[in-house]
Each structure stands twice: as C-alpha cells, then as structure tokens.
C-alpha cells in the first residue's frame, strides 16, 4: 500500500519528465525532427513553381538542412530527384539574375554529400557564375547594380561563396564582396539597420517617396529575412580568417539587434516591420528566416544567449502554431515585393516551408 501511495504521489513528476507539456514540447528534439519531416513531406506532395525557381531554391535550402538534421531518405531522394531528374543540374535561364542562381546552392550541398561526385553536377553552375562575374548586367530602371534588390542577398552571395569554397576559387569570393558592398551602400539604412527592398523604397526627398500609414519608412519583413538568412548561409561558408568576414559579422549583429526590437507579442513579425498595427497577423516566411538567423547566432556564440534566447523561443513556438495537422505551414505572404495583407492561415508557399525547416535545423542544436 505504501509503495502504491508513493507511486501515485510521484506519478505526475515522472510523467512531466517523460512527456513535454505545453509549449515545452516544441523544443523536444524528437518532436522537432518529426515536425520537420512532416512539413517537408507535405511540401514534397504539394509542389509549386518550376523546380529551378527561386521559390524552390529557398525551399530546398531548408530541405537540405532538414536532411542534415533527420537523415530522412525521403527528403534526400526528393532533393536528388529535383536536381538530377527534373533540373538535370541546370540553373534558370537568366544567367544575370540571382533568382536563377539560388537553386545551385542545393546542387553544391548534394555534390558535397555524395560519395560519387560527378563533374556534371556543377558544370552548369560554373558556366553560369563565370558569365555572371565577367559580363555586365543588363541595366534598366531600378536595376542599377547586379544585386539591386535585397532578396538577392539570400539568392546570390551564398551561391558565389559556396561555389568558390567548393572549387577553391577565390575570384568568386572577391566578386561576392564587390556586389554585396554595392547592394549595402544602395539599400541599407544605417539608422534603422534594415534594408529597403529596392530603390523604390529608398527615400530621395521627392514625390516618389513612399511611407507607411503611420508615417514610418517601409521595411519589408521577408525582404530583411532574406538578408539575415543569406548572411547566415554566407558566414557558414566564409573562413574565420577571411579578410572581409568582419564586415558581414558586423552587419549581421546590427540587424539582429534591430530585429528583436520589432518582434511582436505573439512571437512573429509583421509584414511591415515599422508599422505592425497596419498589418495585423504575423507573417511566417520573414519570421522563419529571423528565427533561423537568431538561433544560429546564439549557437555560434555570435549573439548573447541571455539577450536573444527569449525572442528565439517566442518565435519558434509561434511558428509551430502555424503548422496544421497535415504539415502545411500557413500565414505565409504570397510572392511580392513589399508588405501586404493578402494572406491567412490557409496561405502557404514553398519558401515558407524552407524558412521553417532552416529555423528548426538550428533550434534543435541549441538549448532554447
């Protein structure tokens, strides 16, 4: 009887130790892996866009991170099917456009992972990137530099740097430094520590200037998520002693410090970073990239854990609450170039899944 009484007394404690309760379950490693596999498999079963498209470039970036985390054969086979069978290791048709380069990041990841490395896996990437760094960009309107929009900083820099590191060719790293600095000086607001999406959102002091309803500047959540996510993928490749690495680390830390100030109470960021009241409802793709970038920084000791951990935890919990029972991730703003209100719990896109998978791949590594 005494033994039974003690068992009943300590049963709640035993259960609490073995089964995560409430929000704590979102940080359980088994749960994270299961959720990453579920969301990846849902997205595999619901393809969207050309497999060479930038949207899928972001998705497969998350897919490779998910494979590294889970070692799921389904995920790896889907990536190989995309690269080898659907795309035949080719990039998009626009040699000059970073959107058509991003899928090559996954080609390089697969090349590194494969024991049987074949030259054809990276030949088209080599041909395209050589042309990109040696020939002029076909300039028109706001397209005054090669990376003229901030989204390009996810698409282009990791591609050039990853290729340069993979092939041992420093000219691609040097080209990245040049083009990145051009974009930085064109679009980065050194007071707000955020990027304008493109020249249409840079204040010139004339009738073309654009502001939010509250009078603040327009800084798009996903656009800045692209930048921070791209910085992580860039920094993961650059050697510690690379001469220009301090520039990227400084920019990364500046943006992270600003981004956590703009997180909303529910853990997500709004489509417009400086006018959240005009855009009710969190936006998952930008929030996913922010969560990924912040978690990576804490894991790599680039960000102070005590300062950033609360924001990371809130973001990861909120992101998981946007995943339905089937594994579909909702509240993703559709393709665009600025903040919009045109999304809901039923709105999904492949890059939203990619951002979620990237975030999960870092959350599982840390103590959040």
Give the ranges of each region predicted by the language model:
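C-terminal motif of bacterial Sec signal peptides marking the signal peptidase cleavage site
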Residues: 13-16
